[in-house]
Amino acid sequence: MESLSELQNPLLPRSPTHLHRPYPYPEAPPGWSCQEQLYSFLLGGAGPARAHQLLDPGSLQLAVEAWYRPSCLLGRDKVKEPKAGSCETSFTEAREPLAGPAEEGSEPGQAAEDVTIHTVSYGVQEELQGQEDSQEEESDGTSSESECEDAFLTLPPRDHLGLTLFSMLCCFWPLGIAAFYFSQGTSKAISKGDFRLASTTSRRALFLATLSIAVGAGLYVAVVVALAAYMSQNGHG
């Protein structure tokens, strides 16, 4: 150790010109005898070089340089670090933007598809419900009509015997006699089981009896008016 700086920093390299070299290991000066001693020590030589070997930072650097090139040793780490950093940044940058647009692009499509599915299913349900309701209404209408027809057919037609007798005796008797005839025909058709003929004769008997009553009532009114007019004329005379 020759100066105070070397005593304070014994492990620093001697030459400060290593900053502008391709690698930070300084070369030993040409007049330095430690290189020859290091080679003899590494090659297994004996003698004073091996016995009086001193600890020097330059010797450690030369020992590494003797077997490996410094650029290979340091270049590997220097190449790894930026590559690792670039891989991490490129991986994260490539992953995040790809995930974002994919999600943004897929979400509207999925929402629109869901809305379309719900709308179609809702329309189909409405159509099915409308068809079911219309079928139920039609079935109810047909069932009610059939029930009415069945009830009408099961009920035997009436002969209107009392009405025909009243029209024959108390009203216009020719129409009353015809109504009584159809009333008897209705009773015979019912006894035979011919409900179609019975309903026809029953309607005719009802019509003739009603007409006979109307005509008879008109005749009675006309007779009363004529009698009143005749009596009024006789009273004045």
Curated annotation (Swiss-Prot):
List the stretches on the Cytoplasmic face of the membrane. Answer: 183-204
**Region described as Disordered: spans on this chain:** 1-23, 84-111, 127-148
**Family matches, as InterPro entries:** CD225/Dispanin_fam
Q: In which tissues is it expressed?
A: Expression is restricted to the caudate-putamen. Down-regulated in R6/2 transgenic mice, a model for Huntington disease.
Q: Which residues lie on this side of the membrane: Extracellular?
A: 1-161, 226-237
This protein's record includes keyword Cell membrane: no
What protein family is recorded?
Belongs to the CD225/Dispanin family.
- TM segments? 162-182, 205-225
Give the record's membrane topology: Multi-pass membrane protein
Subcellular locations according to the entry: Membrane; Golgi apparatus, cis-Golgi network
Instruction: Give the keywords, sorted.
Output: Golgi apparatus, Membrane, Transmembrane, Transmembrane helix
Annotated Gene Ontology cellular components are:
Golgi apparatus; membrane
In its UniProt entry, what is this protein called?
Synapse differentiation-inducing gene protein 1-like
List the biased-composition ranges (Acidic residues).
129-148
Is Transmembrane helix found in the keyword set?
yes
What is the source species?
Mus musculus
